[in-house]
Amino acid sequence: MVLLGRNPQQLASVAGSLNGGPDAVETLAVAGLSEVPSLIERHRPGVIVNTVGPFTQTGIPLALACLKAGTHYVDLANELDAVLRLLDLNAEAHDRGITIVTGAGFGVLATEALTITLRGEREPALKAQVAALPAVEALGSAVLSSSVDVLAYGGRRYHDGRLVRNRFGADHIRISLPSGGSRQAVGVPTGELEAARRASGAGEVVAYSSEVPSGRIARALLPVMSVVLSVTAIRRQVLRLIEHLRLAPPVSRGEVSWAYARLEWADHSNAEAWLRTGEGYAFTGEVAALVADGLREGSLSAGAFTPGALFGPTLAVRAGAEILLSANKKAMS
């Protein structure tokens, strides 16, 4: 295993925390993203795992380098634009015998696993709602940079099978949890939106997240922030400031992360489910490791996929989650 990054001290710290210790892991410090594609093409590793956002900037260059090198590619992307662009590489990846998996973390897989489970063998749903409600110990500046890109992208939802714009913050939901209480979430253009559309077959799809402030005042400000950040010069300045000051977003602390999905069919029947797991980044690490191991074994289909589409909903269970279905269905754990 080789760890690449810009900070040698952080690389050494991560290497020391892995099984086998630093002696079993090689570290390589690079000046920036621009150096990595040539390294991939030169060394042709079996699998690359990209953990560095914003994935709208890092995903495509690294995935294209992997296609040239014959290397499988995995990332943790959850920005809708990044996920869509990576999935668009499906035909090229298939032709080259390479597998691309985007969204290999709590973001995408948690709600996707629920959607796949709820649909089962049924016909496509009419409507789908999914929500990611993670609890995390800490967030880094790369996460805040990804959040800036999501805000700049603007509101999105699927309507009548088409990806359409809507006002950022217009979609708002309060979700009751099986453990009691509830969580608020706001419609956000994340990779979960596309994964839910594909898994459910629904023409009407909304993806929600609790990681965006959901209070009334915050929802009123979100459209303004989205418009301001859509100006390229302003967004670049904000991203430079985040990197320079190592700013991080506020965290939603706790020991339990939740995800939620609800499908509705044309006959007015519906079903809902929840996914429960621990800290969000710990779950993400398990998912990414399982996906990378699966690709390293070399027995999976070539093409570009979200994790649930390639591995099925049991991937979430293997990573430590429990799926809780509505009363008339059986839980999966």
Q: Each PLM stretch: what is its role?
A:
Residues 55-155, 159, 195, 199:
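Glycine-/Pro-rich loop/turn segments that contact NAD(P) or position catalytic residues
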Residues 2-3:
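Conserved beta-strand positions in the Rossmann-like core of class I SAM-dependent methyltransferases
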Residues 110-114, 189-192, 283-288:
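Catalytic-loop motifs flanking and including active-site residues across diverse enzymes
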Residues 7-10:
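Helix N-cap at the beta1-alpha1 junction of Rossmann-like dinucleotide-binding domains, i.e.
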Residues 120-272, 282:
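Active-site-lining helix/loop region of Rossmann-like oxidoreductase modules
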Residues 24-26, 72, 99, 203-206:
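Conserved beta-strand segments of alpha/beta enzyme cores
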Residues 249-333:
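C-terminal helical cap and adjacent loop that interface with cofactors, partners, or active-site loops
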Residues 18-85:
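NAD(P)H-binding glycine-rich loop region in Rossmannoid oxidoreductase-like domains
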